Curated annotation (Swiss-Prot):
<keyword id="KW-0436">Ligase</keyword>
<keyword id="KW-0131">Cell cycle</keyword>
<feature type="binding site">
    <location>
        <position position="38"/>
    </location>
    <ligand>
        <name>UDP-N-acetyl-alpha-D-muramoyl-L-alanyl-D-glutamate</name>
    </ligand>
</feature>
<keyword id="KW-0547">Nucleotide-binding</keyword>
<feature type="modified residue" description="N6-carboxylysine">
    <location>
        <position position="231"/>
    </location>
</feature>
<dbReference type="GO" id="GO:0005524">
    <property type="term" value="F:ATP binding"/>
</dbReference>
<feature type="binding site">
    <location>
        <position position="160"/>
    </location>
    <ligand>
        <name>UDP-N-acetyl-alpha-D-muramoyl-L-alanyl-D-glutamate</name>
    </ligand>
</feature>
<dbReference type="GO" id="GO:0009252">
    <property type="term" value="P:peptidoglycan biosynthetic process"/>
</dbReference>
<keyword id="KW-0067">ATP-binding</keyword>
<dbReference type="Pfam" id="PF08245">
    <property type="entry name" value="Mur_ligase_M"/>
</dbReference>
<keyword id="KW-0573">Peptidoglycan synthesis</keyword>
<keyword id="KW-0133">Cell shape</keyword>
<dbReference type="GO" id="GO:0071555">
    <property type="term" value="P:cell wall organization"/>
</dbReference>
<keyword id="KW-0961">Cell wall biogenesis/degradation</keyword>
<dbReference type="GO" id="GO:0005737">
    <property type="term" value="C:cytoplasm"/>
</dbReference>
<dbReference type="InterPro" id="IPR035911">
    <property type="entry name" value="MurE/MurF_N"/>
</dbReference>
<protein>
    <recommendedName>
        <fullName>UDP-N-acetylmuramyl-tripeptide synthetase</fullName>
        <ecNumber>6.3.2.-</ecNumber>
    </recommendedName>
</protein>
Length: 517
């Protein structure tokens, strides 16, 4: 891979990003490397000065390591002797130049992208499974949990971000193409658009699953309007669009889709009993829940319109991943696979046995009922989870272990208090990625909004201890829910990813201790 200095200048001019260029000589320069981390510079490299934590010394280090050209929003004396491309927006520039450096790998992939407040990961895993049933060893996945760039075990690794930085995104795409991948299923976060990680990227199919207030705070989206706006950008940049017609703010969502996509390329889905508030749209697919219990979920997918029927994906489906709320995610995945040319003959078996790390994982503890570990980390996902369990287990006592991250998602905290008041019998408030905040203060913030006449609250900073106390306090007919972290193998504490054995590993340790003691 390489990119010439001349090509960089032309691309930046084309996108109206170039403010000025300081070129050291008239000869064109080929950059054979690209980086925003000075430690990853080796040889003639295009280096980006980006991020709130960028320091000029990083540019000096990049220069010492062989960088030839730097891109920044202002000149740096540390860059004297290097070609300097001064741009209006560094994150947009990095996205545009990274795509070019890796030779536009998205053009060699069928890209299916999901956005939504909840369900992105589940829908993505369902889609990957269906596509793998039809085209084994050819499906890439970029999710909150895993990144898959090839068919071999060492080509599957843990993700750092839901949607990676643009340079990493296009590098991973190129690696996937080189490894023979033909399709990519990816999650796209609102932060990805806010920070221009997917700037210039067009998807073959874009999904809008739902929207509720989340990720609103000083370090994220300033307002809900900004959060929604960034979510909608996925639809504006998709060739075909699929929308959950039951989403809040549907009119705005549908309007965004129609700005760049013809109605015949927009597909709507909803549950069997849903009736839209407007009569100028048609629901293309309906899913009818047959049974959702603690063993499996079964539903029927019914194509309603002619264009829906043409995909040949209607039929009866079962899910090993329990929870009636997952039927909506499964419907989205089946439609996505259908738009990629995969019909029900692969979708039915492909989706049936899917299990997702940290999603509805459960185990029985002798004498203490069932324990569920789930990534549910906002009001909407917690409500869906607790409502399902309350119904499936015939109104059990619910003991919930939960915390809220520091430095972000401040709007989640009153949501946790609300959902605990609505559903929990006992709440064990604990630590969950506190970052630079004091976890005790976060716990107090949640606790202050809980109705203590309805919920018994325990404040336990040590997450292991909180899980142990919740399980120990539970009876044989009770349900313990450990929410928020799912399969995360670390706690984010003061800028450090501190190893964490995962919630389920802790649950199993506690269960073993109880059985032995």
């Amino acid at each position: 891979m390489a990119l010439s200095l001349r090509a960089c200048i032309l691309l930046l001019k084309e996108h109206h990003l170039l403010k000025s260029a300081a070129i050291q000589n008239t000869e064109d320069v080929d950059m054979t490397g690209i980086a925003y981390d000075s430690r990853k510079v080796s040889g003639p490299t295009l280096f980006f000065c980006k991020g709130d934590k960028f320091r000029p010394i990083y540019l000096s280090m990049a220069k010492d390591n062989g960088a030839r050209t730097y891109v920044a929003e202002k000149p740096y004396v540390e860059g004297n002797g290097l070609n300097a491309l001064i741009v209006r927006n560094i994150t947009k520039a990095m996205a545009i130049l990274s795509a070019a450096f890796f030779d536009y790998p998205q053009d060699d992939l069928f890209v299916i992208a999901y956005t939504g407040t909840k369900g992105k990961t589940t829908a993505s895993y369902f889609t990957e499974a269906i596509l793998n049933e039809a085209r084994p060893r050819h499906i890439a996945l970029f999710s909150t949990i895993d990144t898959v760039v090839g068919p071999e075990p060492d080509q599957r690794f843990k993700s750092n971000l839901t949607t990676p930085e643009s340079l990493d995104l296009f590098r991973d795409m190129r690696e996937a193409v080189e490894n023979g991948m033909t399709h990519l299923v990816m999650e796209v976060s609102s932060q990805a658009y806010l920070r221009n990680r997917v700037f210039g990227l067009t998807y073959d199919v874009g999904f809008f699953l739902n929207i509720t207030p989340d990720h609103i705070g000083p370090n994220e989206h300033p307002t809900f309007a900004n959060y929604l706006h960034n979510k909608l950008q996925l639809l504006v940049n998709a060739r075909k669009v699929v929308i959950n017609a039951e989403t809040e703010h549907f009119d705005q969502v549908y309007a965004a889709a129609t700005t760049t996509t013809y109605p015949e390329s927009i597909y709507l889905f909803a549950s069997a009993g849903f009736r839209p508030k407007r009569d100028d749209i048609d629901i293309d697919f309906r899913f009818d829940s047959q049974e959702a219990d603690v063993a499996e979920s079964r539903f029927t997918l019914v194509p309603v319109t002619e264009k829906a029927a043409a995909l040949n994906i209607g039929g009866h489906y079962s899910l090993a991943l329990i929870g009636d709320f997952n039927e909506s995610n499964a419907t989205a995945a089946i439609i996505g696979a259908g738009l990629a040319g995969v019909d029900a003959s692969a979708a039915v078996p492909g989706i049936a046995k899917v299990k997702i790390p940290g999603r509805m994982e459960h185990t029985k503890v002798a004498g203490h009922g069932a324990v569920y570990v789930d990534y549910a980390h906002n009001y909407a996902s917690m409500k869906a989870l607790l409502s399902f369990l309350k119904h499936a287990y015939k109104d059990p006592r619910l003991l919930v272990v939960v915390g809220s991250p520091g430095d972000k998602g401040v709007s989640r905290r009153p949501g946790f208090a609300k959902v605990l008041t609505e559903f929990a019998t006992e709440a064990f408030l604990t630590t969950d990625d506190p970052g630079y905040e004091d976890p005790a203060n976060i716990i107090e913030e949640i606790d202050s909004k809980i109705d203590h006449s309805k919920v018994k609250v325990h404040k336990v900073l040590d997450r292991k201890k909180a899980i142990a106390e919740a399980i120990s306090d539970s009876g044989p007919n009770d349900i313990v829910v450990v929410a928020g972290k799912g399969a995360d193998p670390y706690q984010k504490v003061r800028g450090v990813n501190t190893p964490w054995p995962t919630d389920m590993a802790v649950v199993k340790q506690v269960a073993k201790s109880l059985q032995e003691g």
